[in-house]
């Protein structure tokens, strides 16, 4: 049951991991998972929520691993950025098939494939009810897609960054390794840093903290969780300035 008649957020930045798209597969994109995510995003659009999306690329390529094997880190990160573009194109296609207008913007120019990232264009598209998928990370090596999510969230003045994960939120310990780990409902930025909780990498997290961008971590694999988060229901873990 929905507690609020209208959404708690007007504009969100949804961060999806590349791994989330692979479903039970070990690699690539599971079409069923992609279509389910597109349907969940469609629900938000129909509620009048403006949706920006950042997708990782870990299902297709991980630059850090090859860097350890000797590949130049910059080259590896460039390849990772291209992986996020591939995921973005797949998501746009799934949204179009669900009759949702969507646009892919890339932080690196890819003429004929997708649009270049432009802040003013992105704001206009969001206001017109289109989903904007921000791909290629920040366009710079050494920055994660979590950093890109926080950066784009701040730029588009989103109400919140929603980090979709495979667990129900932020726990006292790894819930997979420790079944007794407890879920936090709310945390402050300071508590996350003091407790050394792994929400996202430090560069991304401090960017959000410095700009007072709230972060909510939730389980995208739980049907309806995204809608419940946006409707302001108790779901996942909220991180902001005053827990």
Swiss-Prot record:
GO terms for biological process: 'de novo' CTP biosynthetic process; UDP biosynthetic process. NCBIfam families: pyrH_bact (TIGR02075). InterPro entries: AceGlu_kinase-like_sf (IPR036393), Asp/Glu/Uridylate_kinase (IPR001048), Uridylate_kinase (IPR011817), Uridylate_kinase_bac (IPR015963). Pathway: Pyrimidine metabolism; CTP biosynthesis via de novo pathway; UDP from UMP (UMPK route): step 1/1. Keywords: Allosteric enzyme, ATP-binding, Cytoplasm, Kinase, Nucleotide-binding, Pyrimidine biosynthesis, Transferase. GO terms for molecular function: ATP binding; UMP kinase activity. It comes from Vibrio campbellii (strain ATCC BAA-1116). Pfam families: AA_kinase. It catalyses: UMP + ATP = UDP + ADP. ATP binds at residues 15-18, 58, 62, 165, 171, 174. Belongs to the UMP kinase family. It comes from the Bacteria. Gene3D superfamilies: Acetylglutamate kinase-like. Catalyzes the reversible phosphorylation of UMP to UDP. GO terms for cellular component: cytosol. Residues 23-28 are annotated as: Involved in allosteric activation by GTP. The gene is pyrH. PANTHER family: URIDYLATE KINASE, URIDYLATE KINASE PUMPKIN, CHLOROPLASTIC. This is Uridylate kinase. It is an enzyme of class 2 (transferase). It is found in: Cytoplasm. Its EC number is 2.7.4.22.
């Amino acid at each position: 049951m929905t507690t609020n008649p209208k959404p708690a957020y007007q504009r969100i930045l949804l961060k999806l991991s590349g791994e989330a798209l692979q479903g039970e597969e070990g690699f690539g994109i599971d079409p069923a998972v992609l279509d389910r995510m597109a349907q969940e995003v469609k629900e938000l659009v129909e509620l009048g929520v403006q949706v920006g999306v950042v997708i990782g690329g870990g299902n297709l390529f991980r630059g850090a691993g090859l860097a350890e094997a000797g590949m130049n880190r910059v080259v590896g990160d460039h390849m990772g950025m291209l992986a996020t573009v591939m995921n973005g194109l797949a998501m746009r296609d799934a949204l179009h098939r669900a009759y949702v207008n969507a646009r892919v913007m890339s932080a690196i120019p890819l003429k004929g494939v997708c649009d270049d990232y432009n802040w003013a264009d992105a704001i206009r598209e969001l206001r017109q009810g289109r989903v904007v998928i921000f791909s290629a990370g920040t366009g710079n090596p050494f920055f994660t897609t979590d950093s890109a999510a926080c950066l784009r969230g701040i730029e588009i003045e989103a109400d919140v960054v929603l980090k979709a994960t495979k667990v129900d939120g932020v726990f006292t310990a790894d819930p997979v390794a420790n079944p007794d780990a407890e879920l936090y409902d709310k945390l402050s930025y300071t508590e996350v840093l003091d407790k050394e909780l792994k929400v996202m990498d430090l560069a991304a997290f401090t960017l959000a903290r410095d700009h007072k961008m709230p972060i909510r971590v939730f389980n995208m694999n739980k049907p309806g969780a995204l809608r419940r988060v946006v409707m302001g229901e108790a779901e996942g873990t909220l991180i902001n300035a005053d827990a």
